[in-house]
Regions:
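N-terminal ligand-binding/catalytic initiation module
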Residues: 1-152, 409, 420, 426, ...
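Glycine-rich phosphate/diphosphate-binding loop of Rossmann-like nucleotide-binding domains
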Residues: 150-151, 155-267, 417, 448, ...
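Secondary-structure transition/capping motifs at alpha-helix termini
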Residues: 71, 123, 172-181, 203-217, ...
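N-terminal Rossmann-like NAD(P) cofactor-binding subdomain of oxidoreductases
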Residues: 138, 228-230, 268-273, 279, ...
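Rossmann-fold NAD(P) dinucleotide-binding segment
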Residues: 252-261, 270-291
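Flexible, glycine/charged-enriched surface loops at secondary-structure junctions
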Residues: 127-132, 179-183, 208-217, 379-389, ...
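Short acidic, glycine/serine/threonine-rich loops at helix termini
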Residues: 22-23, 46-57, 88-95, 140-146, ...
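Adenosine-phosphate binding glycine-rich loop
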Residues: 153-160, 173-176, 290, 294-422, ...
Length: 465
């Protein structure tokens, strides 16, 4: 195995002190770090527990910070927290570079994360953005709750996923002509993503006039055991209990769809093919324009394909997926399925947090980002192609607009520490953007008179007369 260059900073459970972590962070050659993406490698999307091999996730996310939001590369730092791995295949691999031990959990793990957060802010400043990525659900929610009011931090798997899903729903309601608060939503999957989306849907419904209780009544969660009902509320977390329904126990999605007659069906279960033709047909039977989001990644784990979604609803569905699908041609019309990818959201959120030096990131930030994303979907995209997200080419401009909207909110909430407040936020943001394109140093084409050319090359001319 050849090691060519470092790609980020590794911090292990054996470095569990503020001073040691501070020392490790000080080894990073750039001093003006403003954005960190950190993972412990436990729940790498579609791959599971990769331990120390999870470093590619922070590196990739920060590459998108640069490409999609124009954040300066020198401001970015990828970090991997190595507390071991429960992947026996890696532990048995003689070339595995991480700690060879089972994952550390409990107080020692919590202390390491506390020390990490303190060390980061001591080394780089209290406004340093810290994005948590691909932590297991058992850690993701507690860490977000513990740090979000004291640090500039967010969890993309929870909040970013929620924001992009709600953006798609808001855009879809422009075609259904019904507010989100007037719809019933069924979730297949009640993990980080499902709960995050449900919570943000509640916030949108509250802004549309419902109480929190009324909003939660419109949301139905299914986990691996079926619909979450009050009869089995004791078997789920407090977060799930808020959505428990006073209904008979139903173990299959088809039962729930037939009983509830939802307007929206969202899949975050990683169960391939869970949205069967019968379920899709039932959605079409109950809705003129059913909304179906199969958001699980990768493509092999999507709840249904785009082709099946359009086929079994006779083209009526407003469909989005977590993974890319090809365009679908049916009944003489071309459908362009939208991809509900977090990259519509987190680059713009990060850009705002970094440029306006946010002390923390309020929850409403992600609703603001969702609304801006939804508003960026053109009428042509909606009406001609039934696509509920902007095209990928528009993401960089979308990130700028999200950053401006969030910047206004940060100052309203008193959590932006950049002073004085820029009068023209758009101008301020655009002045800070990093360009990854090389400007040509010479003209690509020279005009030479044909008479001065011999076999395609210019003939030198003498200055002598």
């Amino acid at each position: 195995m050849s090691f060519f260059h470092f790609r980020g900073v590794y911090i292990t459970i054996d470095d569990n002190s503020i001073s040691k972590i501070y020392q490790i962070l000080s080894n990073w050659p750039r001093k003006n770090v403003k954005a960190i993406v950190v993972t412990d490698g436990e729940r790498i999307l579609g791959l599971g527990d990769l331990g120390a091999y999870g470093m590619g996730i922070p590196v990739g996310k920060l590459a998108l910070y640069v490409a999609l939001a124009g954040i300066q590369p020198e401001w970015c730092l990828p970090v991997l927290i190595d507390v071991g791995t429960n992947n026996q295949k890696l532990l048995d691999d003689p070339f595995y570079t991480g700690l060879r031990r089972q994952r550390v959990r409990g107080p020692e793990y919590d202390q390491l994360l506390d020390n990490f957060m303190i060390a980061v802010t001591k080394r780089f400043g209290s406004e340093t953005l810290i994005q948590f990525e691909d932590f297991a659900s058992s850690n993701a929610f507690p860490l977000l709750d513990r740090y979000k009011n004291d640090y500039c931090t967010f969890n993309d798997d929870i909040q970013g996923t929620a924001s992009v899903a709600v953006a798609g729903l808001i855009a879809a309601t422009r075609l259904t002509k019904a507010k989100l608060s007037q719809t019933k939503i069924v979730f297949l999957g009640a993990g980080e993503a499902g709960l995050g989306i449900a919570d943000l849907c509640v916030e949108q419904m509250k802004d549309e006039g419902l109480t929190e209780e009324q909003a939660r009544e419109k949301i139905f969660l299914l986990n691996s055991k079926g619909l979450i009902t009050k009869d089995r509320a004791h078997t789920v977390t407090v977060r799930h209990q808020k959505y428990a329904k006073d209904l008979p126990q139903m173990t299959t999605l088809l039962e729930v769809v037939k009983a509830v007659k939802p307007n929206v069906l969202i899949g975050v279960s990683t169960v391939a093919g869970a949205f069967t033709p019968e379920i899709l047909g039932e959605m079409a039977k109950n809705n003129e324009r059913p909304i179906v989001f199969a958001l699980s990644n990768p493509t092999s784990k999507a709840e249904c394909t785009a082709e099946n979604a359009y086929r079994y609803t006779n083209g009526a569905v407003l469909f989005a997926s977590g993974s890319p699908f090809d365009d679908v041609e049916m009944n003489g019309k071309i459908y362009k399925p939208g991809q509900g990818n977090n990259s519509y959201i987190f680059p713009g959120v990060a850009l705002a947090a970094v440029l306006f030096k946010a002390k923390r990131i309020p929850d409403k930030t992600f609703l603001i980002a969702a609304r801006r994303c939804a508003a960026s979907v053109s009428e042509e995209s909606l009406n001609e192609y039934a696509r509920v997200y902007p095209s990928a080419e528009e993401i960089r401009e979308l990130s700028v607009n999200i950053a401006i909207d969030i910047g206004n909110h940060l100052y309203e909430e008193g959590v932006a520490t950049l002073h004085p407040e820029p009068e023209d936020k758009e101008l301020f943001v655009r002045e800070q953007l990093y360009s990854y394109e090389y400007e040509p140093t010479v003209n690509g084409l020279y005009d030479w008179p044909e008479t001065d050319c011999r076999v395609g090359f210019p003939i030198p001319k003498s200055n002598e007369h």
